[in-house]
Amino acid sequence: MRLWPRLALYAMAILLLAGCSNNSNRDYAKLPKGSYNDTSYTVKKGDTLYFIAWISDSEVSDLARINKLKPPYRLEVGQKLRLDSSSSTGRLTSTKRKSSSTTLAKSTPPPGASRCWRWPTSGQVISKYSTADGGNKGIDIAGKRGQPVYASAKGKVVYVGNQLRGYGNLIMIKHGEDFITAYAHNDTMLVNNGQDVKAGQKIATMGNTGTDTLMLHFQIRYRATALDPLRYLPAQGTPPKC
C-alpha cells in the first residue's frame, strides 16, 4: 500500500487538536451529567474543564471559548468561569443547540466515508467533536487504566510514539488511501510502526499519558480533515453492520 510521505504524516499529526487538560481522575460513569445548574462556577481543588463541562451539561469547547481559555485549559482554585454565553442567564443551551446544528452541517460525510468503524474502547464520552476554532477534533472517552483500546477498522499503523506534546502515547492507523484514525493518551502501546492490524484488534491500553485524565482521545480524519466520530460509530455495545 502506498503511504503518504512521512513528513506529511508528522505534520498532520501536529495539527491534531485534542482537549488536553489537568483533570484529576474521575469515574464519569458515577457522575450525574448536568447536575449543576447555574450561570457561573467557581473552580475548586481538583476541578477541570472536562469535569465542569460534564456537570453543567456543556461542551468543553464552548466553555473554553466564552472564558477565553487555551489548551491545555489549566485552571486555578477560586477562578470564576462563566457557563453562559452572555452576562445574563441562559447557560449554554441555545449556544450548544446552534453549535450542534453547525457541526452536523460542516461534518457531512465525504465520498467513501461510510466504512465499517468500530468503537475503539467503551466508556462515557466526556468531550464531543466541535467545529469551533480550537475545539475538539475528535471525542474523548473516559474509562479505567489498562482497559483495552482497539483498532476502529483494519489498516496499517503509520505512527507510534510520544513526540507530540499533549497527546502522550499516540497511535495513528491509515485505512486505505484517505482515512486515518488517531488514538491518544495510551498507557501501553501494543503495535509497531508499519504493522497491519485488523478491525477490533487490541492496539493499546487506556492511560493518561500527556494528560492527567484517564481517557482515550479518538479521531477519524479524511484526507487530514477531522470528522465527527459519533456520526460514523454504531451505538456503544452494538457491532457494526458490515
Descriptions of predicted regions:
Residues M1-L9:
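Bacterial N-terminal signal peptides that target proteins for export
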Residues L16-G19:
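C-terminal motif of bacterial Sec signal peptides marking the signal peptidase cleavage site
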Residues S21-K45, F51-L92:
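Extracellular LysM carbohydrate-binding repeats and other cell-envelope/extracellular binding modules
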Residues V43, L69, G143, S152, ...:
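Surface-exposed strand-loop junctions at beta-sheet edges and helix termini
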Residues L49, L81, I141, L170-I171, ...:
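Short hydrophobic beta/alpha edge segments that flank linear recognition/processing sites
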Residues Q195-C242:
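Conserved, short, structured surface segments that act as functional micro-motifs
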